[in-house]
Amino acid sequence: MGLSGISPLSLLLILAIIVALFGTSKLKTIGSDLGEAIKNFRKAMNSEETNDTQKDDHKPL
């Protein structure tokens, strides 16, 4: 058994259907866009944490 009761053969069949529907070039574009979105999200989260710690440093005790 694979993930959540899905067999590896079923996963390969689903992957083949997705490739047939979208084509490899479209999947590559989607993958690149998704990776860039995740990278930008992480960058925004890290900069927000940095800004929060800088604001906390200047609070009076």
From Swiss-Prot:
InterPro entries: TatA/B/E (IPR003369), TatA/E (IPR006312). It is a single-pass membrane protein. Pfam families: TatA_B_E (PF02416). It is found in: Cell inner membrane. The keyword tRNA-binding does not apply. It comes from the Bacteria. One of its GO terms (biological process) is protein transport by the Tat complex. The chain crosses the membrane at residues 2-22. Keywords: Cell inner membrane, Cell membrane, Membrane, Protein transport, Translocation, Transmembrane, Transmembrane helix, Transport. One of its GO terms (molecular function) is protein transmembrane transporter activity. One of its GO terms (cellular component) is TAT protein transport complex. The keyword Transport applies. Part of the twin-arginine translocation (Tat) system that transports large folded proteins containing a characteristic twin-arginine motif in their signal peptide across membranes. TatA could form the protein-conducting channel of the Tat system. Belongs to the TatA/E family. The Tat system comprises two distinct complexes: a TatABC complex, containing multiple copies of TatA, TatB and TatC subunits, and a separate TatA complex, containing only TatA subunits. Substrates initially bind to the TatABC complex, which probably triggers association of the separate TatA complex to form the active translocon. This is Sec-independent protein translocase protein TatA.
